[in-house]
């Protein structure tokens, strides 16, 4: 019988680079307009007051101020807002 013993090792061995997702600025932190607050895939966090959403679902500050995470609505959703100075 013919055996291909090591074929699996050539098909494995790939890994993608980390995408550096997550919250970049936490609640209570001061941010400048244009600062990235959350990098995400999908909308785990939603854009609230003074926050914009990029085409890759990144949330960014539209105004300078303090970051706040607010949970509200039905179904419960977490909104990121900026309390402008």
UniProtKB/Swiss-Prot annotation:
CC per GO annotation: cytosolic large ribosomal subunit
Gene3D superfamilies the record matches: 2.40.50.100
GO molecular function: structural constituent of ribosome
Chain positions covered by the region annotation Disordered: 1-21
Statement: the UniProt record of this protein carries the keyword Secreted: no
One of the protein's GO biological processes: translation
Keywords annotated in UniProt: Ribonucleoprotein, Ribosomal protein
Family: Belongs to the bacterial ribosomal protein bL27 family.
Protein name according to UniProt: Large ribosomal subunit protein bL27
Phylogenetic classification of the source organism: Bacteria, Pseudomonadati, Pseudomonadota, Gammaproteobacteria, Thiotrichales
